[in-house]
UniProtKB/Swiss-Prot annotation:
Keyword annotations from UniProtKB, A to Z: Cytoplasm, GTP-binding, Hydrolase, Metal-binding, Nucleotide-binding, Ribosome biogenesis, RNA-binding, rRNA-binding, Zinc
Known function: One of several proteins that assist in the late maturation steps of the functional core of the 30S ribosomal subunit. Helps release RbfA from mature subunits. May play a role in the assembly of ribosomal proteins into the subunit. Circularly permuted GTPase that catalyzes slow GTP hydrolysis, GTPase activity is stimulated by the 30S ribosomal subunit.
Protein known as: Small ribosomal subunit biogenesis GTPase RsgA
Organism: Synechococcus sp. (strain CC9605)
Residue intervals of the CP-type G domain: 78-237
Gene3D superfamilies: Nucleic acid-binding proteins, P-loop containing nucleotide triphosphate hydrolases, Probable gtpase engc, domain 3
Subunit structure: Monomer. Associates with 30S ribosomal subunit, binds 16S rRNA.
Cofactor(s), by name: Zn(2+)
One Gene Ontology term from the biological process aspect of the record: ribosomal small subunit biogenesis
Length: 304
């Protein structure tokens, strides 16, 4: 028993529950379950070192009988998302419904901008596609391709698109699903991982917004080395504060700048004379409105 208590192992934090962490081990010691409920070493708190879902960790003081251990060290992260907090993400999948709630270009763009800010690979998933006619869906896909995305279409009701989606996510070690609540993230995960049976909720009729059924971040296995994170839904992500950062978050604007960069270093690409960016693209009005919104938020108030 003493030898077991001194044993160590490595793994990944797959869930946070109150003051405990669930760690899935890479290789479980003999007689030990593959997933352990863990506390943190006090020295981690003293060093100000937080532990998040997705972190690679070393655990010690393993108690196989109780399925318990202590997180002793956190390995360096190669990426970190702040909202929701997830470490070591390699792909961000923005999930948007085509109906119930209706597709909202402004809201869709805000989620895509938030995803682009991570600097990670971003893909777009369209859910509830059975609620649109084939022609209407084709028009929407063509529109989004003009934004610089090649969306994957999915319907849990019709059972279509799941194989292509599973194959796409299996190529990333850790994917995060994000998007407004009520767009079908939990239904999508139930299709990807049939054993989960995550709780789903209807969309409220008046606001066309979903009730939040996911309350915490948790990782689920998609294969031997791939995991996907279900995250709490949120309805209105924030814009970046830096106006220079805003422009590069639009793939269609980046595409214009790629062959011929604008000759003005601090240009905001608003039709200035000599600017290398055309204003003739669908989301230009949204880009301009976002710049105005940023300006109003950064302007100091006149109140006391």
């Amino acid at each position: 028993m003493a030898d077991t208590a001194r044993s160590v192992a490595s793994g990944m934090v797959v869930a946070l529950q109150a003051n405990y962490l669930e760690v899935e081990l890479d290789v479980a010691p003999d007689g030990c379950p593959g997933r352990l409920l863990c506390t943190r070493r006090t020295r981690l708190s003293h060093r100000g070192e937080a532990v998040y879902v997705g972190d690679r960790v070393r655990v010690e003081a393993i108690d196989p009988g109780q399925g318990r251990a202590v997180v002793a060290e956190v390995e360096p992260r190669h990426s970190f998302l702040t909202r929701p907090p997830v470490a070591n993400v390699s792909l961000v999948a923005v999930v948007l419904a085509v109906e119930q709630p209706s597709f909202d270009p402004d809201q869709a763009s805000r989620f895509l901008l938030t995803a682009e800010r991570t600097g990670l690979e971003v893909i777009l998933l369209l859910t509830k596609t059975d609620l649109l006619s084939a022609a209407a869906l084709e028009r929407l896909v063509t529109r989004l391709q003009g934004w610089g995305y090649d969306p994957l279409a999915f319907s849990s009701a019709a059972g279509t698109g799941i194989d292509a989606l599973r194959q796409r996510l299996a190529g990333a070690q850790l994917s995060v699903l994000c998007g407004p609540s009520g767009v079908g993230k939990s239904s999508l995960l139930n299709q990807l991982c049939p054993d989960l049976q995550l709780r789903t909720a209807a969309v409220s009729g008046r606001l066309q917004r979903g009730r939040h059924t996911t309350r915490h971040v948790e990782l689920f296995p998609l294969g031997p080395s791939a995991r996907v994170a279900d995250t709490p839904g949120f309805n209105r992500p924030d814009l970046p504060e830096d106006p220079q950062e805003l422009g590069v978050l639009f793939p269609e604007l980046r595409k214009q700048l790629d062959p011929w960069p604008c000759r003005f270093r601090d240009c905001l690409h608003r039709g200035e004379p000599g600017c290398g960016v055309s204003t003739d693209w669908e989301r230009y009005s949204l880009y301009e409105a976002a710049l105005i919104e940023q300006s109003s938020l950064s302007r100091p108030s006149r109140g006391g």
